[in-house]
Amino acid sequence: MGPGLLCWVLLCPLGEGPVDAGVTQSPTHLIKTRGQHVTLRCSPISGHTSVSSYQQALGQGPQFIFQYYEKEERGRGNFPDQFSGHQFPNYSSELNVNALLLGDSALYLCASSL
């Protein structure tokens, strides 16, 4: 496993109702190398004030990373400190992952609720 090995980070919208329900993530996909930093942004459905983020590794079910409600962290899964988040006044949020590891290669999901 040389230093050129790529870590794939993919995103997929997850929300209530149809795909065009309004939850958006950016960027929609990324290719990063180990050791790099990544910021993933999530915009909730209009009127929703709660945003949750999940990681889904290949062959696994989604794992809860964190939930923000009214700009405060209300819950956190069993993830290391390299995973952090923030919710902005407009209720959009971001997930930051510092010093990417090969094991961080996964599908990252975002959901919003009232």
Curated annotation (Swiss-Prot):
Glycans are attached at N90. Disulfide bonds join C42-C110. The keyword Disulfide bond applies. One of its GO terms (cellular component) is T cell receptor complex. Its main location: membrane. InterPro entries: Ig-like_dom_sf, Ig-like_fold, Ig_V-set, TCR_beta_variable. Residues 1-21 form the signal peptide. Transmembrane segments: none annotated. Keywords: Adaptive immunity, Cell membrane, Disulfide bond, Glycoprotein, Immunity, Immunoglobulin domain, Membrane, Receptor, Signal, T cell receptor. Residues 22-114 form the Ig-like domain. It is found in: Cell membrane. GO terms for biological process: adaptive immune response; cell surface receptor signaling pathway. It holds the Pfam family V-set. Alpha-beta TR is a heterodimer composed of an alpha and beta chain; disulfide-linked. The alpha-beta TR is associated with the transmembrane signaling CD3 coreceptor proteins to form the TR-CD3 (TcR or TCR). The assembly of alpha-beta TR heterodimers with CD3 occurs in the endoplasmic reticulum where a single alpha-beta TR heterodimer associates with one CD3D-CD3E heterodimer, one CD3G-CD3E heterodimer and one CD247 homodimer forming a stable octameric structure. CD3D-CD3E and CD3G-CD3E heterodimers preferentially associate with TR alpha and TR beta chains, respectively. Probable non-functional open reading frame (ORF) of V region of the variable domain of T cell receptor (TR) beta chain. Non-functional ORF generally cannot participate in the synthesis of a productive T cell receptor (TR) chain due to altered V-(D)-J or switch recombination and/or splicing site (at mRNA level) and/or conserved amino acid change (protein level). Alpha-beta T cell receptors are antigen specific receptors which are essential to the immune response and are present on the cell surface of T lymphocytes. This is Probable non-functional T cell receptor beta variable 5-7. The gene is TRBV5-7.
